């Protein structure tokens, strides 16, 4: 498993377990490795929304849509 895959897996696990701050950290690290991945931007947005950081979450969803306008998960 690559470093990126490990970060994504850990982020998803923490998100599912309700550890939103940890999930956010993993997704931010993953985005440093792959900044043009719309799914990562969407996952970061979900973590931010779960933390009540709605404006930042909206920015992430918009970034995801800029990268892939067909990405319905971020709308």
Q: For each predicted feature, which ranges?
A:
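Conserved structural position within tetratricopeptide repeats
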Residues: 29-32, 62-66
